[in-house]
Amino acid sequence: MSWEVVIGLETHVQLNTRSKIFSGSSTAFGAEPNTQANVVDVALPGVLPVLNKEAVQCAIRFGLAVNAEIAPRSVFARKNYFYPDLPKGYQISQYELPVVGKGALTIQVGDTEKTIRITRAHLEEDAGKSMHGASPGQSGIDLNRAGTPLLEIVTEPDMRSAAEAVAYARKLHELVQWINICDGNMQEGSFRCDVNVSVRRKGQEKLGTRREIKNLNSFRFMQQAIEFETRWQIETLEDGGKIEQATVLFNPDTGETRAMRTKEEANDYRYFPDPDLLPLAISTEDIDAVRVTLPELPSAMKARFERDYGLSAYDASALTASRSVADYFTATLAEFGGEAKLVANWVMGGISAKLNEEGREITDAPVSPVLLAGLLKRIADNTISSKIAKDVFEAMWAGEGDADAIIERKGLKQVTDSGAIEAIVDEVLAANAAMVEEFRAGKEKAFNALVGQTMKASKGKANPAQVNEILKRKLAG
């Protein structure tokens, strides 16, 4: 009997707030150690936490985006454990009554759509950071990160492969950036995933013993970690061994997971309501105030692009993969006013290729939506051919001006005069008699070669449609 892997994710999303969740300290990344930690963050006696309203609004935005229940009353709890980077000796989190309840996120793996159930999302504070190696034989603590607001998003164990888990993580990563609650910077720790993996015999309902892979900050590492952990658990069970519940780390150098500690249960943390914080009350008016600030969501925008612009599902998905790409496409289309498919082809083609080549984000592209729209207008009105447009685009990317200026300066206007094109065709046919005979003998490739020769003779300026029409007429004569 074969095995089935069962996967659930817990994702820590660092919220885009200017200050920490319970203090006024800055959340800016990269400051000198302990320069962004005030008396609340270092847990001096007598200080009290004050909840950051902006963090609550971020949680509500997320809940609305995944069609989740927003709790009218939620409670902050103390999660008690000792660690050097946790100065209070407890973390303020939520346990029995989280701010966001059941929701869902739909993913796509290949041609298959699947809905992943979201169990809950709760607010909590981040811990500090242990620093090793700065001084021989000593470790330090940086409390800049202590108190940074997090939204922990927990799924049901609905995923059945590494591919599904990565698809969910990518979709969630895209969503939290889209609704502007997280910058999504995985290298800086803004988006960290813990993956719970267990295996069971196919057809068995009871879940196997899970092991939690902690702090994965790369989709590639997530894929590798899940695949290794799955193989390890299956091999262990088939060899007669037993899986112990544990927290494990993934080593990207070896591609292996290793147990770090026995996995704690909720009872180990002795949760109880934080007496320093009142229950969080959220009214319908509070939710509605956040709802009006929510942008059109990726799924709705994708459907609109397919419905209103006639784009394929593939094109619509690619254009809504990130908010910045969708905004660029929309702005270009509005300025261009022409066929959406032409805009989509250039955004996914020329623009995307240059961005990948140079490692840029689309927000840093030297060709703005206005500039790209100017180029597309000249393609649409046959001022230039699609081939010449690529040369104009390269010049625009290099900062040589807008499309009209480059076309004028370099003399790139397309030749549309039928008489001029006919003269070029006559010269090409006269110079390539053998190719003409091949075409008349039934070799279709010869026609394409003659088109190529004509375009070459015109230095790429002849209108391709006219070249085709004139060639066909003359060869048929």
Curated annotation (Swiss-Prot):
User: Does Endoplasmic reticulum show up as a keyword for this record?
Assistant: no
Q: Which organism is it from?
A: Methylobacillus flagellatus (strain ATCC 51484 / DSM 6875 / VKM B-1610 / KT)
Q: What function is annotated for this protein? A: Allows the formation of correctly charged Asn-tRNA(Asn) or Gln-tRNA(Gln) through the transamidation of misacylated Asp-tRNA(Asn) or Glu-tRNA(Gln) in organisms which lack either or both of asparaginyl-tRNA or glutaminyl-tRNA synthetases. The reaction takes place in the presence of glutamine and ATP through an activated phospho-Asp-tRNA(Asn) or phospho-Glu-tRNA(Gln).
Q: What class of enzyme is it?
A: ligase
> What is the top-level taxon of the source organism?
Bacteria
| GO terms for biological process, alphabetical | glutaminyl-tRNAGln biosynthesis via transamidation; translation
User: Is Chloroplast tagged as a keyword?
Assistant: no
Please give the Gene3D superfamilies that the UniProt record associates with this protein.
1.10.10.410, GatB domain, N-terminal subdomain
Q: Which named protein is this?
A: Aspartyl/glutamyl-tRNA(Asn/Gln) amidotransferase subunit B
The record's section on PROSITE patterns has: GATB
Query: Annotated Gene Ontology MF terms?
Result: asparaginyl-tRNA synthase (glutamine-hydrolyzing) activity; ATP binding; glutaminyl-tRNA synthase (glutamine-hydrolyzing) activity
Point out the gene that encodes the protein. gatB
Q: Output the SMART domains linked to this UniProt entry.
A: GatB_Yqey
Please list the disulfide bridges. Answer: none
Q: By its UniProt entry, which InterPro entries does this protein fall under?
A: Asn/Gln-tRNA_amidoTrfase_suB/E (IPR017959), Asn/Gln-tRNA_Trfase_suB/E_cat (IPR006075), Asn/Gln_amidotransferase (IPR018027), Asn/Gln_tRNA_amidoTrase-B-like (IPR003789), GatB (IPR004413), GatB_C_1 (IPR042114), GatB_Yqey_C_2 (IPR023168), Gln-tRNA_amidoTrfase_suB_CS (IPR017958)
> What's in the keyword line of the UniProt record?
ATP-binding, Ligase, Nucleotide-binding, Protein biosynthesis
Can you state the subunit structure given in the record?
Heterotrimer of A, B and C subunits.
Catalyses:
L-glutamyl-tRNA(Gln) + L-glutamine + ATP + H2O = L-glutaminyl-tRNA(Gln) + L-glutamate + ADP + phosphate + H(+); L-aspartyl-tRNA(Asn) + L-glutamine + ATP + H2O = L-asparaginyl-tRNA(Asn) + L-glutamate + ADP + phosphate + 2 H(+)
Q: Which residues form a coiled coil?
A: none
What family name appears in the similarity comment? Belongs to the GatB/GatE family. GatB subfamily.
Q: What is its EC number?
A: 6.3.5.-
